[in-house]
Amino acid sequence: MSSEMIHVEVVYALPHEQRVLKLVVEQSATVEEIIRTSGILQMYPEIDLTVNKVGIFSRNVKLDARVRDKDRIEIYRPLLADPKEIRRKRAEQAKAAANQS
């Protein structure tokens, strides 16, 4: 019994580098299987699939999700700061600067 093969990409972006790996995998493969097969975990040992979230075309998915032909599997880095907190601080700084004018 042969399984249909599909084309996918595994992507990991760093601040100054983006790694895109193109693979041909069995259609039945899960996101986790594809990531492990890609070799990206060896290239970037800081990736921890129990910590890093993953997605397909900017939509979060679970590691056991199935993929479709031409899907882009993205491995997300953990946020270093809370976006709400950053916006709040910027607003405070802008308000303080406006009050000094």
Curated annotation (Swiss-Prot):
Protein name according to UniProt: UPF0125 protein VC_0850
Domain of life the protein comes from: Bacteria
InterPro entries named among the record's database cross-references: Mopterin_synth/thiamin_S_b, RnfH, RnfH_sf
UniProt cross-references to HAMAP family, sorted A to Z: UPF0125_RnfH
Family named by the database record: Belongs to the UPF0125 (RnfH) family.
Gene3D superfamilies cross-referenced by the UniProt entry: RnfH-like (3.10.20.280)
Alphabetized SUPFAM superfamilies for the sequence: MoaD/ThiS (SSF54285)
